[in-house]
Amino acid sequence: MEFPYTGNRTAVWIVAQLHILFAAFILGAPIFVVISEWLGYRKQDPRYDRLAKEITKVTVILFSMTAVTGGLFIFVLLAAYPQFTTSFINQFYMVFAVLYPALFIAETILMYAYLYTWDVWKGEKKGRHIALGVLLNLVCLLILFVINGPTSFMNTPPKAEGVSPQDFIAAATLWDKIANQSWFPLSLHRIDGNVAFGGFIAGMIAAYMYMGSKTQEERAYYDWMGFAAIWIAVGGSLLQPFTGLLLAYEMCDYDFSFCPYMMADQLSMFFETQGIMIGLLFLGINYYSWLSVKRIEGAENVRMTILAPIVLIVLLPATMWVMDKFWIPDPMSLAFLLPLMLSPFLLGRFIPKTVSARTVIKIGFIIMLISDAVWLTPAGFVATGTDMPDDMKLPEGWDYLSSMPAKLSAILTLVYVTVVNYVLYNRTIKQGTILWGKIDFAAQFVLIFLAFTSTWIMGLMGAVRSLLKKYFHVYSLVSDLSAESFTPTLSYSAGWITAITVAFIAIVSVAALVALRPSVARVREPEGSPVPIAAK
């Protein structure tokens, strides 16, 4: 069968990517929700409980979309590649016929039980409800680990020296196939990615509800909801570069040809685009922090040790020097970098010289822009190719900026600036007073931008991981002999990734409005002046 307009491979790509996005949300949102519910119980703050319940309502609606797109994915895959699909399902029959359906049914039961016992198990029974949420998350994690087995198998099927791949797979157990080289790092990367993804989507929902709120009370709540969601998302985002590097390291260790194919050959411009998007993501996070600080009364009185801006300025060049001399996993790199990064927090109290919080944030922004520039610096000025003419390469002395030590240094600096801003923001809200509901209106567009960007990055890097198989369905085992067995251009891929992202965001937006609109006050209440609320 040949799908019109898109072709078979792109048709499979569209439904698979949509399914993965919905699945990522319903697997990541429960982690986000239980953390929020636990914080509400611990702090006795009903806002956290309301946040958790509202996101659960949206998750339940999107649960059906996950099932629909999953079923559609199987049908399209069978129609487009019947022989491969049948053979692949037989390889993982126990997963697809027993484990995955059983876990999915268990997740469905627990999801609905979690929602409909919310108002029943409260007060003294709240701990019971949180325990149910933890159980739901355990099942979600099991689903993630189970389904990542076949997914990672397609990139890194197990192998052994002296044995042909076909003979080894024929004798391999189900566990051998699941526990392949990229299975665990892929699972780790998806766990923290799903937590961040759930937080960004929750922030987008908060932005919609803030913009549609009719009363100051509702605006104050959804302002707070966006604030809480984005910082939970940041927690997941800070881990993603490192789990992503671990995944790339394991895949390159499995077959070194993956590395140049990603970084210097057919997919090099995909990685350039990834650098741009992740740089924009971190800039957006820190811009939201800046807008949040501006609405805190007393923020101008918050000071930070002079060591903070000094370390921000010297960290990038210092890290590049250390990484060049002591590359991973040499522990000497930590011996140099940890004292430097911790010095503002450990030694700052002994140094009387301080600077304002806003000065630190501004310097951090400049350092982030420089780090982004280093991250994006290519080895040369052509899209692909490892053997470029000298006039197309970076000038001698500047070529270091395209090396992996420089790239890792830029990532580390981006994460460090975000951590410093987070610490500074927490210090500000403890010493000042937040006027909830009075944040700059532009912050709502930042939240929507962050959700869109994180979704787009997921689509891009999913495409990269899949395209690493080159002209195989299962790398080195099952060849793809179809006419579509080629690496698409970045423009073609980006077009479909954007279309998929827009479709996903639109469906989530409708689900959020359907689930949460009744909770907004129907009658317009008279607005008074905003009441300052001390941050907790």
How should these model regions be labeled?
Residues 271-374:
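Hard-cation-handling environments
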Residues 121-165, 177-275:
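Long, contiguous internal "core" modules enriched in hydrophobic/ aromatic residues
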Residues 59-70, 134-155, 231-244, 309-320, ...:
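Hydrophobic alpha-helical membrane-insertion segments
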Residues 23-34, 101-113, 193-206, 272-290, ...:
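Hydrophobic cores of alpha-helical transmembrane segments in multi-pass inner/ER membrane proteins
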Residues 1-54, 58-67:
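N-terminal signal-anchor module of multipass membrane proteins
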Residues 9-20, 87-102, 169-193, 259-275, ...:
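Short aromatic-rich membrane-water interface segments that cap or initiate transmembrane helices
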Residues 44-61, 87-94, 98, 118-138, ...:
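Membrane-interfacial loop-to-helix junctions in multi-pass inner-membrane proteins
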Residues 62-133, 150, 243-259, 263-271, ...:
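Membrane-interface helix-loop-helix modules in multi-pass inner-membrane proteins
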